[in-house]
Amino acid sequence: EFGNTALIGENRQGVILDYQLFRESAADSQLLFESLLRVWEGTGHHVEGVVTDRGFASAANSRALKEGNTFDGLCPRKPAKLSQRMQEEKFARLQRRRAQTEARIGILKHGFLGQPMRAKGFAHRELALAWGVLTHNLWMLARMRKIKKKAAPKAVLLQAAA
């Protein structure tokens, strides 16, 4: 996406909690637990569930998620296994939600980093990504506050009517 491999992790509200740009191409399945550790260290909260694309799926990752009492929403590599997992309501719902993450990468890339990204060299691309994530998250927080303000009068009216 960025001329280098980028890992983006977000919460259900769309706020990016973890990102990393890699100089060399890295296997997705090897990146998962470093990301979860950074989220835990940064927020102090245990991740309740992980939803990814096929690149992150591995028996070792699924086993470790189970041992950590974290919902395993890793998209299976085998289509038959994916069809089977899509019968599970929570898995299917979270996989549909994952499509928003793909869109989030597009928003980050085109809306906040520019197309093409003008930063040359790894250090400058890494810095541009950091600024892009910060700007994106400020935008998301402002949108969340705006939505909350719109909902507040309705809640007050409903409470007054009760």
What is the predicted role of each segment?
Residues 68-77:
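Short hydrophobic/aromatic-enriched beta-strand-loop microsegments
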